[in-house]
């Protein structure tokens, strides 16, 4: 230990300290209140990164007393851990970090410490405050981007009547700039969350959903696990149980469409020629014939079922399989203005094993949630061309004053704390519905993979510290929960600021969020109404202010700044649609 005392490098291992019970008062950006804890003298200078170290009572019966939370010089402080604290932490378990695999989906590769000089990571300015864990560069071939966007033959005719073309495909020259900007935006250091306010936000939404689960016990009957076959094929004729998209990629490192790894269907054998229709006939007892999807991976090309079993076994032990999300450039028509700025959107595709495992555990739950949009505050599954739209309007105008908004780069810059909180809500619903513990463990690990993702960018592998991949199978559902938690965070943060930190929702100083706000989300879009008689602090301007404090940018539906507290109901815009009552 003595040899380390004068070094600047972080200490590893353990060291003895003496301590006494005290009230620890911290002055921090989070505004943490004084709490019961311990103070002690360190045999070395405290350093950034020491927070989280365990304080253990040594002896014949050793026990964990607390966690190091603050230090100044050789003075340290820690919070005490009790049974209640440990119980709370078990709501979502972060999986254990493991070594990077050398083979994925039958493809072997090496990871080198040296990263090519042209890679975007070398072009991050020194003054940019970014944080990421650079894993290295793999030795597999990388793809090149080319756009398939072409000019319509109608453009010339349209110009004769005054309609001028204002869109085109992305420029290839913008590829490096797009990857560079995306790398910086994802990994830029953002302000910390206040864990107390986040807990209030999560408790609020769980209270609402818990009351619903108690009042609607039949909901649990519709939440169940799916078999491997049903996760691939869905259930024909049942809303929400669609088959897996066979035209999308298998993910890294295969990077080829799923259809390339499928067996030909029974229909193909019957016709005697290949077909894109992966279906099979079912001869029923009454003599009728029905059809079902018949998506089967060819084990000779890729044994996906075995790959999935290996993933599930590892995930059940809370060990990370280190799934890799490949960053791809989106080939879409862009306005000339965006082309001039060198903009190309980047999305991250998920590996097929993650997609299947997630569908097996969550698809039935997600489908059941779509039947209760106002309970789960999500418009996923809502028919915008039918009666659902009228019911939605009635709900979101429940109170007198309305708000609406959007986020800038929502999931890519999602704080890991909110992401983990959203997964804890989903896990709560799964657990309450009777999903076995082994599969809840798998869900924990999948949540860890998504909340703390590993990205592949043009050969570079790195782990992000505050981002959610845009191509994972729970994207729209999880984004909606992220949205709902963010709104609650802004709500409680506004009161926490106004009440000069004396506010505690358990004392009933103000109503719970869902009692005074009627919120509806779809991904990063939201629209709501507020009971201003009971809730004067929560509005568009306060939302933007409070979320800005944690690095989120809350904008108007048109992506501009909010200039007023509320929006008239007649001017509400949601999912690029307005609400106009039928004249009849």
Predicted ranges, named:
Residues 74-83:
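A short, polar/charged loop-to-alpha-helix boundary motif
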Residues 1, 72-75:
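Catalytic-histidine neighborhood of serine endopeptidases
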Residues 43-69:
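Catalytic nucleophile loop of clan PA
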Residues 1-18:
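Short glycine/Trp-rich loop-beta-loop segment that forms part of the substrate-binding cleft
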Residues 34-41:
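Short Pro/Gly-enriched beta-strand edge/turn motifs at strand-loop
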Residues 6, 60, 70-72, 409:
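Conserved beta-strand elements of beta-rich interaction domains across eukaryotes
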Residues 24-29, 52, 70-72:
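Terminal interaction modules at protein C-ends
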Residues 25, 89-584:
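Viral RNA-dependent RNA polymerase
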């Amino acid at each position: 230990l003595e040899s380390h005392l004068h070094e600047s490098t972080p200490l590893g291992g353990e060291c003895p300290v003496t301590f006494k019970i005290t009230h620890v008062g911290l002055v921090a950006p989070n505004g943490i209140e004084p709490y019961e804890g311990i103070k002690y003298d360190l045999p070395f200078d405290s350093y950034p990164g020491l927070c989280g170290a365990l304080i253990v009572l040594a002896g014949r019966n050793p026990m964990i007393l607390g966690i190091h939370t603050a230090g100044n010089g050789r003075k340290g402080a820690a919070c005490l851990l009790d049974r209640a604290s440990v119980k709370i932490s078990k709501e979502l378990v972060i999986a254990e970090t493991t070594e990077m695999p050398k083979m994925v989906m039958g493809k072997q590769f090496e990871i080198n410490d040296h990263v090519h000089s042209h890679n975007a990571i070398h072009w991050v300015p020194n003054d940019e405050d970014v944080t990421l864990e650079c894993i290295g560069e793999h030795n597999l071939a990388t793809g090149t981007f080319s756009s398939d966007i072409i000019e319509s033959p109608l453009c010339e005719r349209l110009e004769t009547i005054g309609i001028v073309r204002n869109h085109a495909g992305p420029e290839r020259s913008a590829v490096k700039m797009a990857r560079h900007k995306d790398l910086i935006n994802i990994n830029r250091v953002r302000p910390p969350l206040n864990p107390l306010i986040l807990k209030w936000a999560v408790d609020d939404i769980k209270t609402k959903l818990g009351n619903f689960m108690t009042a609607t016990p039949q909901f649990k009957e519709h939440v169940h696990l799916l078999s491997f076959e049903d996760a691939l094929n869905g259930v024909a004729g049942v809303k929400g149980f669609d088959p897996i998209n066979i035209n999308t990629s298998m993910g890294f490192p295969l990077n080829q469409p799923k259809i390339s790894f499928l067996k030909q269907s029974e229909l193909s054998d019957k016709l005697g020629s290949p077909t894109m229709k992966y279906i099979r006939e079912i001869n029923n007892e009454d003599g009728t014939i029905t059809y079902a999807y018949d998506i089967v991976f060819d084990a000779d090309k890729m044994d996906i079922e075995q790959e999935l079993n290996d993933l599930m076994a590892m995930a059940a032990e809370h060990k990370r399989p280190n799934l890799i999300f490949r960053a791809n450039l989106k080939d879409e028509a862009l306005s000339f203005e965006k082309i001039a700025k060198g903009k190309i959107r980047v999305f991250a595709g998920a590996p097929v094993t993650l997609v299947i495992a997630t569908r097996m555990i969550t698809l039935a739950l997600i489908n059941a949630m779509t039947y209760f949009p106002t309970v789960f505050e999500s418009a996923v599954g809502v028919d915008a061309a039918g009666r659902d739209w009228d019911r939605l309007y009635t709900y979101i105008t429940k109170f007198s004053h309305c708000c609406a908004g959007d986020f800038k780069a929502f999931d890519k810059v999602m704080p890991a704390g909110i992401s983990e909180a959203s997964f804890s809500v989903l896990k709560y619903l799964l657990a309450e519905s009777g999903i076995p513990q082994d599969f809840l463990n798998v869900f924990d690990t999948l949540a860890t993979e998504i909340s703390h993702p590993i990205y592949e960018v043009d050969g570079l592998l790195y782990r992000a510290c505050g981002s959610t991949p845009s191509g994972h199978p729970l994207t729209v559902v999880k984004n909606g929960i992220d949205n709902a938690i963010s709104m609650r965070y802004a709500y409680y943060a506004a009161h926490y600021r106004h009440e000069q930190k004396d506010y505690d929702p358990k004392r009933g100083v103000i109503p719970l969020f869902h009692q005074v706000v009627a919120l509806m989300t779809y991904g990063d879009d939201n629209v709501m109404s507020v009971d201003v008689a009971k809730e004067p602090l929560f509005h568009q301007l306060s939302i933007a202010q409070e979320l800005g404090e944690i690095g989120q940018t809350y904008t108007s539906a048109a992506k501009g700044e909010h200039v007023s507290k509320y929006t008239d109901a007649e001017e509400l815009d949601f999912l690029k649609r307005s609400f106009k009552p039928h004249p009849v």
